[in-house]
Amino acid sequence: MATSHPDPTTSRHVAVIGAGAAGLVAARELRREGHSVVVLERGSQIGGVWAYTSQVEPDPLSLDPTRPVVHSSLYRSLRTNIPRECMGFTDFPFATRPHDGSRDPRRHPAHTEVLAYLRDFAKEFDIEEMVRFETEVVKAEQVAAEGEERGKWRVESRSSDGVVDEIYDAVVVCNGHYTEPRHALITGIDSWPGKQIHSHNYRVPDQFKDQVVIVIGSSASGVDICRDIAQVAKEVHVSSRSTSPDTYEKLTGYENLWLHSTIQIAREDGSVVFENGKTIYADTIMHCTGYKYYFPFLDTKGEVTVDDNRVGPLYKHVFPPALAPSLSFIGLPWQITPFPMFELQSKWVAAVLSGRVSLPSQDEMMEDTKAFYDKLEASGIPKRYTHLMPDDSQFEYDNWLADQCEYPRIEKWREQMFYIGFKRIYAQSSTYRDNWDDDHLIVEAYDDFVKFMSSYQELLPMLKT
């Protein structure tokens, strides 16, 4: 079965759902390709997850489906775990701004600097004029037009002006995946009397003063939050499934922070028993256990499902074969350098919608996707890691996207900087943000940046000394 494509250089009316980093660059690329774009954003500002709020949800575990949802999961102390040079969009560098004293010049800046960068990006490319703020998408579904095998998309949205139904040629989903928490499954937890919270609702450590806290998870948020809490807590115990069962060690530089293996059982007397045999009486368990992909507004009649955190079937993590090219997803992969990938995915989607780039047939896309899933299964990789891109896979994917669009491949300095930085996180988790040994790559980055912003020319002599 052949996949239907727009005529070459066709302009489409496109709804972009979300005005975070993915939605902003999707809007830019779609408009660059000649499409008419409306960005629907439920919040009052751009930035998505990077728009910090001190507000948290009333349900600390975010289990109640009727709860008022807070989109952002940022904690106040968060700094980027990726160097700013490799984090930015390819043609809009995320470089320091030496003449603006209000900005954070650090190489791993605070979340406020990332939001400021996204605002700069939106201003530079006049993106906000395409955004409808405080507009929540209630439903998006395909509707058949008379005489057409495949229809357009009806998007129902709600704002202070009421509910609106609109018809679009295509929908690009950019609503992020850091809002709907995943939780650890702990034997006996229903009878355990202590408090539980997911990191989605963590902002500051004050509430944990003098407590014994167990932090489940040792990825980015777990590493940061356990150290944040250790400043005020009596004890902090980190449970990590990536350690051996007998693990029990005090973390360097802390007198009240220990690393354990997984939890064996939680008991009604308030104790928690680890696989290493240690028993801890804890006040609070903090779940730093990641998030679920969640699209409550999207009705695809079963063509796209979320199964154990696999969104699929999706060709190259973007297009559902049965609904391509009118439905696409930007930003699903993780453990990546996100903004450049969002940009390349957006270029691909925009070019496919205009007809400048063609997709394989529906059958060929399904065959490719099934082969990818079969490869994961044969390697023993669980479904929940479908969109994880470890090792070289993210840059192979980025370069594949670039080739589709006849756009330059990812710079070698950017790849090397990511790899070195990623290794540094685990080798020196407490200090990696302020100690590094890849200055030569910083110089290469700024050599590239001057092609886009001549104001960085003055920084080069300082960087090279």
Swiss-Prot record:
<keyword id="KW-0560">Oxidoreductase</keyword>
<feature type="binding site">
    <location>
        <begin position="18"/>
        <end position="23"/>
    </location>
    <ligand>
        <name>FAD</name>
    </ligand>
</feature>
<comment type="function">
    <text>Catalyzes the conversion of methylthioalkyl glucosinolates of any chain length into methylsulfinylalkyl glucosinolates.</text>
</comment>
<dbReference type="InterPro" id="IPR050346">
    <property type="entry name" value="FMO-like"/>
</dbReference>
<protein>
    <recommendedName>
        <fullName>Flavin-containing monooxygenase FMO GS-OX-like 2</fullName>
        <ecNumber>1.8.-.-</ecNumber>
    </recommendedName>
</protein>
<dbReference type="InterPro" id="IPR000960">
    <property type="entry name" value="Flavin_mOase"/>
</dbReference>
<dbReference type="GO" id="GO:0050660">
    <property type="term" value="F:flavin adenine dinucleotide binding"/>
</dbReference>
<keyword id="KW-0521">NADP</keyword>
<keyword id="KW-0274">FAD</keyword>
<dbReference type="GO" id="GO:0050832">
    <property type="term" value="P:defense response to fungus"/>
</dbReference>
<dbReference type="Pfam" id="PF00743">
    <property type="entry name" value="FMO-like"/>
</dbReference>
<feature type="binding site">
    <location>
        <begin position="217"/>
        <end position="222"/>
    </location>
    <ligand>
        <name>NADP(+)</name>
    </ligand>
</feature>
<dbReference type="InterPro" id="IPR020946">
    <property type="entry name" value="Flavin_mOase-like"/>
</dbReference>
<dbReference type="GO" id="GO:0004499">
    <property type="term" value="F:N,N-dimethylaniline monooxygenase activity"/>
</dbReference>
<keyword id="KW-0285">Flavoprotein</keyword>
<comment type="similarity">
    <text>Belongs to the FMO family.</text>
</comment>
<keyword id="KW-0503">Monooxygenase</keyword>
<dbReference type="GO" id="GO:0050661">
    <property type="term" value="F:NADP binding"/>
</dbReference>
<dbReference type="InterPro" id="IPR036188">
    <property type="entry name" value="FAD/NAD-bd_sf"/>
</dbReference>
